[in-house]
């Protein structure tokens, strides 16, 4: 597999984040770096195809955003709704089914098969790499993951998820169960 390419600034990502930065609040820096890491992994799996770049960038900015916009532990559908609404409102021209699918299936345990399979599967694999902090590698080398993580450090992102599970669910255990039931797909 080719060396991983890391883009440290993505204009589209920064502009998409801008209206939501205050909503995300203190979790912004950690979430932003999570988004950059997952975009980096997904674009690697897609061979840096420009055909998918705008979709991947948009999907990852929005993929967890329902945690903050809707304060929801079952955040996939709220995240999809915000992404689809903004896609229509701002006329980005992204395929709504591909955008929805990349968000909806990013926690799927097993390989995604279906419409828009290539991009959805790349996004799914990318998020699993980052969600597990590299324990699941999906074919990437440890050194590639370490390289990406050194450029975009965690900055407490995974701890933020645990805090939100507790805040929204009443306890870390109950919140963790609600999150798992609400977002994991088979």
For every predicted segment, state its role.
Residues 37, 60, 98-101, 121:
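Amphipathic alpha-helical interaction segments
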Residues 1-11, 21-49, 91, 108-186:
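Divalent metal-dependent phosphate-bond-processing catalytic cores, especially two-metal-ion Mg2+/Mn2+ enzymes
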Residues 53-70, 79, 100-107:
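His-Asp-centered metal-binding catalytic motifs of divalent-metal-dependent phosphohydrolases/nucleases
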Residues 38-42, 74-89:
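An active-site-proximal "capping" alpha-helix that borders the catalytic cofactor pocket
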Residues 94-102, 112:
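Active-site-proximal substrate-binding core of FAD-dependent oxidoreductases
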């Amino acid at each position: 597999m080719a060396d991983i390419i890391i883009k440290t600034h993505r204009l589209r990502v920064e502009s998409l984040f801008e209206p939501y930065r205050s909503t995300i609040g203190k979790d912004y820096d950690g979430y932003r770096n999570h988004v950059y890491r997952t975009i980096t992994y997904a674009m690697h799996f897609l061979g840096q195809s420009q055909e998918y770049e705008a979709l991947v960038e948009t999907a990852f900015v929005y993929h967890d955003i329902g945690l903050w916009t809707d304060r929801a532990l079952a955040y996939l559908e709220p995240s999809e709704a915000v992404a689809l609404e903004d896609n229509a409102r701002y006329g980005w021209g992204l395929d709504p089914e591909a955008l929805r699918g990349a968000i909806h299936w990013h926690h799927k345990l097993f390989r995604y098969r279906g419409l828009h399979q290539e991009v959805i599967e790349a996004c799914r694999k990318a998020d699993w790499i980052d969600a597990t902090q590299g324990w699941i590698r999906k074919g990437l080398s440890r050194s590639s993951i370490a390289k990406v993580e050194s450029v975009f450090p965690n900055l407490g992102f995974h701890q933020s998820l645990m805090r939100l599970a507790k805040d929204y669910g009443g306890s870390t255990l109950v919140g963790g169960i609600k999150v798992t039931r609400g977002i994991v797909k088979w």
